[in-house]
């Protein structure tokens, strides 16, 4: 069973175990989004800015709610919630990099890229030293994707 846990500042606002539909996209190119639909009356406490945890025995993802839309289907009010993985926060202006110059282990580069954010790095399989130089403004998420490409690796979210 998969639980969809909606929180605000760490406080649980709702737990959904039964939904009309749900879709998780977790692709090798770095895209990680989640969308689910529930009956509107059950979702009246959901709005943009909340966090959604997708949790089961094999899954553990953390998302931000970015869009909530309502519709009617056969006379039933439906609420659709669209979410982006927490790593999308790295696209925010506050995390932009003017430049970045790193030489060393990929795991240390990951730590450096995530420093000062709400995210932490997990297991980093590549160990061959790398050089990553960025000399124009970019988001930390773009820099993270460059690191992944440079290592020939994949990103796995949780």
PLM features per residue range, with description:
Residues 82-158:
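Charged- and aromatic-enriched interaction segments used to assemble
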Residues 1-99, 145-152, 156-157:
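Assembly/oligomerization scaffold segments
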